[in-house]
């Protein structure tokens, strides 16, 4: 499934426009449509997300 750059920004909690900029710099895998617009494959975006196990997340919040 293809997703918009704005959806990637929201999913990764990035400022709007960051995914599009990274794609244009060839630093993020993307698909360039015939009209020049950029889309991302949702499975590739999900692969960028690192899941932190809950027991580690609890340790990170301790002073």
Language-model-detected regions and their locations in the chain:
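Short Lys/Arg-enriched helix C-cap and helix-to-coil transition segments
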Residues: 31-38
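Structural signal for short hydrophobic segments within the conserved structured cores
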Residues: 1, 29-31
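A short, Lys/Arg-enriched interface patch at domain edges and termini
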Residues: 43-63
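Glycine-centered, phosphate/nucleic-acid-interacting loop/turn motifs that mediate DNA/RNA or nucleotide
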Residues: 26
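Short amphipathic alpha-helical segments
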Residues: 4-5, 38-40
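Polyanion-binding surface elements
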Residues: 1-22, 51
């Amino acid at each position: 499934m293809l997703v918009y750059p704005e959806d990637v920004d929201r999913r990764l909690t990035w400022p709007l426009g960051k995914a599009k900029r990274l794609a244009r710099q060839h630093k993020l895998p993307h698909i360039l449509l015939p009209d020049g617009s950029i889309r991302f494959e949702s499975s590739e975006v999900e692969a960028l997300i690192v899941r932190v196990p809950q027991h580690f997340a609890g340790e990170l919040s301790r002073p």
